[in-house]
Amino acid sequence: MKKWMAGLFLAAAVLLCLMVPQQIQGASSYDKVLYFPLSRYPETGSHIRDAIAEGHPDICTIDRDGADKRREESLKGIPTKPGYDRDEWPMAVCEEGGAGADVRYVTPSDNRGAGSWVGNQMSSYPDGTRVLFIVQ
């Protein structure tokens, strides 16, 4: 009788696991998805992709008011380099940005074009919007 009950319990547990939909990790952790065009901005796109792969967040929580302070924090101690911009990920406009951001030297045309593109994409999103970045 005990073996039969244990078998029944095990079968019920397996059946329950198969029938209950599994939660998709991170499914509710963002509000919008932004598909960043790697072919259009290859240096900035590669930087974003690499920084995310190294453990930096792929989510940007928009906070425009704090951008200047976070930019100062993220670029502190990173010298300027003639002919290059310092690109940071997470971006300064993101709550996740600031001290500890990944910084890479990229050409100004790529960096500023990418910044303009992202700004246009997110212009209608209010502060607090959580944007998932996917580089493709």
From Swiss-Prot:
Keywords for this protein: Hydrolase, Manganese, Nuclease, Secreted, Signal, Sporulation
Region forming the signal peptide: 1-28
Domain of life: Bacteria
Subcellular location as annotated: Secreted
GO biological process: sporulation resulting in formation of a cellular spore
Principal subcellular localization: secreted
GO molecular function, one term: nuclease activity
Free-text remark on how the cofactor is bound: Mn(2+) ion stimulates activity.
Bias kind Basic and acidic residues: ranges: 63-75
Entry's Gene Ontology cellular component terms: extracellular region
Pfam family, one: DNase_NucA_NucB
Catalytic EC class: hydrolase
EC number: 3.-.-.-
Family: To B.subtilis NucA/ComI.
Functional description taken from the UniProt entry: Degrades both double-stranded linear and covalently closed circular DNA. Likely to play a scavenging role in order to supply nutrients under starvation conditions.
Protein name: Sporulation-specific extracellular nuclease
